[in-house]
Amino acid sequence: MSVSTETKSSGRITQIIGPVLDVSFPAGKMPNIYNALTVGGKNEAGQEISVTCEVQQLLGDHCVRAVAMSATDGLMRGMEVLDSGKPLNVPVGAATLGRIFNVLGEPVDNLGPVNTKDQLPIHRSAPAFVDLDTKLSIFESGIKVVDLLAPYRRGGKIGLFGGAGVGKTVLIMELINNIAKAHGGVSVFGGVGERTREGNDLYMEMKESGVINESNISESKVALVYGQMNEPPGARMRVGLTALTMAEFFRDINKQDVLLFIDNIFRFVQAGSEVSALLGRMPSAVGYQPTLATEMGGLQERITSTKDGSITSIQAVYVPADDLTDPAPATTFAHLDATTVLSRNLASKGIYPAVDPLDSTSTMLQPWIVGDQHYQCAQNVKQTLQRYKELQDIIAILGLDELSEEDRLIVARARKIERFLSQPFFVAEVFTGSPGKYVSLAETIQGFNLILSGELDDLPEQAFYLVGNLDEAVSKAATLS
C-alpha cells in the first residue's frame, strides 16, 4: 500500500540497542511488518543523519521494533521516525546495468543518479504455481566441463564451492559474458557479507574484461548489489533480496533469461542469525535462528523459471569448518540442482576452469533429460578419470611401465580428457593471450566421444590443452609435430 507524503505517520525512538530501534507511534498509526522507516535529523555535531530501518516486530503499547540498514551512530532517543507506508523499494530495469548499489538501491559508484522511474518492493511473493515453467531444460553455458558433467538447469540453483585463488571470480565473469552473448540475457551480482576488497576487485576486473562497459554504461551486462562484511546485519540480511528483485524485473517484465550470483549464501544465513538474536528470539540448532528454513525458502522459491523467462542462480557456498551437516549449508543443499566444485589440485596443474569433474554433480544428468548420448558420454568420461585417479598411487611408486597395456591406454586417454576439459575464456584473454571459446554441447560430446573411442590416440596430449572444440585440437597437434 502506497501512502502519500502528507499522510505519512511519524513516531519517536524510545530505545536503541546497536542496530535495533524501538519506535513509538500514535494509536491507529502503526506501520506494518516490513515497512521501511526513515530516521532523519541532526547528530550532536550538527551533521545530517538519515537511517532507513525495516519493521520486524509489533511489540504492543503502540511500539514497533525495527532493524537498521545502516550504522546507527548519532541516533538518539526522541528522534522523529517517518513511516514510508511500504516496504523498501529499489530501482529496477536496464538503467541498473553497469552500476553498483547498496541494499537500499542507492548507487554507490559516484556515477550520478539512476535514470529509471521503475521501482519494486524487495518483499514479493514467489511466482504462482500456474506461472511456473515445469519443463526440465538444460541451460547451456558454453563451458565444456560444466555442460558435459554437471549441467545447469534453466531456472535452477547451482552451488559453487571453492577456496581462495582457484578461479571462482573468473568462472563467474565468463558465465556473465556467455549468457549475454549466447542467450541475450543479463546478470545480477549480489555480494552478501563478503570482503569489500573482493567486491572492488570484481568491479575492476569486470571493467577490464568488458563485462561492464565504461565508455557506454548501457552496453554493460551486469548490475552489482553489495552489502559487505562491515555493514550492519540488517543490510546483509536484505541485500540478497535487493539483487533478486532486480533480477525478477528482467525475468517478468523484460522476459529475459537472467543469471543471479549470490556470494555468499552462508552470509545471508549468518546475518539472519544475528538479527534473530538481536530481536530476542530463542536460538535453534547450533545457535541458528528458528526461522532458518523459512528465510532460506523465501529467497530460494523466488528463484525459478516462469513461462516468461528464467532466473538461474549460482550461489557461492561457504561451509563452516568443512562441516556439511552444519544447518546453514545443509539447508542450502536442499534447494540446489547442481554443484560446481573447484579443485586446487587442478588449478596447480594449470588446468582452467579448475572444475573437479568427479566431485561436481547435477540432478539434470539423467538419460531421460539430457538424452542417452550425452549421459553415456559423461559416464564414460567419469569412469576413465576415476580409473586414472585409482592408478595414480601405483604410477607414483612404480612408474607407468609397470601398468598393463590396457591401463596405460586408459591413463593416456584420461590425461587427454583432463586437458580437453580446460578451455580459454573470453574474460581471461587479457591475461592468457588466447582468444576465448564458446563450445556448444554437441561439439563437446563429439570431442569426448572421439577421445574415448581411441581415434585420437596418436595425437599428443598437449594438443588438447586450452582449446575449444576438437578441430582446434587437431590443428594444434599439426603445429606441435
From Swiss-Prot:
Cellular compartments per GO CC: chloroplast thylakoid membrane; mitochondrion; proton-transporting ATP synthase complex
Matches recorded under InterPro entries: AAA+_ATPase, ATP-synt_VA_C, ATP_synth_F1_bsu, ATPase_a/bsu_AS, ATPase_alpha/beta_chains, ATPase_F1/V1/A1_a/bsu_N, ATPase_F1/V1/A1_a/bsu_N_sf, ATPase_F1/V1/A1_a/bsu_nucl-bd
Domain of life of the organism encoding this protein: Eukaryota
Keywords associated with the record: ATP synthesis, ATP-binding, CF(1), Chloroplast, Hydrogen ion transport, Ion transport, Membrane, Nucleotide-binding, Plastid, Thylakoid, Translocase, Transport
Its EC number(s): 7.1.2.2
SMART domains registered for this protein in UniProt: AAA
Catalysis: reaction(s): ATP + H2O + 4 H(+)(in) = ADP + phosphate + 5 H(+)(out)
Main location group: plastid
BP GO annotations: proton motive force-driven mitochondrial ATP synthesis
Enzyme class, first EC level, given as a word: translocase
Compartment list: Plastid, Chloroplast thylakoid membrane
Entry membrane topology: Peripheral membrane protein
Chain residues that bind ATP: 162-169
GO molecular function, one term: ATP hydrolysis activity
Any single Pfam family the record assigns to this protein: ATP-synt_ab_N
Cited HAMAP family: ATP_synth_beta_bact
Assembly and interaction partners: F-type ATPases have 2 components, CF(1) - the catalytic core - and CF(0) - the membrane proton channel. CF(1) has five subunits: alpha(3), beta(3), gamma(1), delta(1), epsilon(1). CF(0) has four main subunits: a(1), b(1), b'(1) and c(9-12).
Family listed: Belongs to the ATPase alpha/beta chains family.
Function: Produces ATP from ADP in the presence of a proton gradient across the membrane. The catalytic sites are hosted primarily by the beta subunits.
Record protein name field: ATP synthase subunit beta, chloroplastic
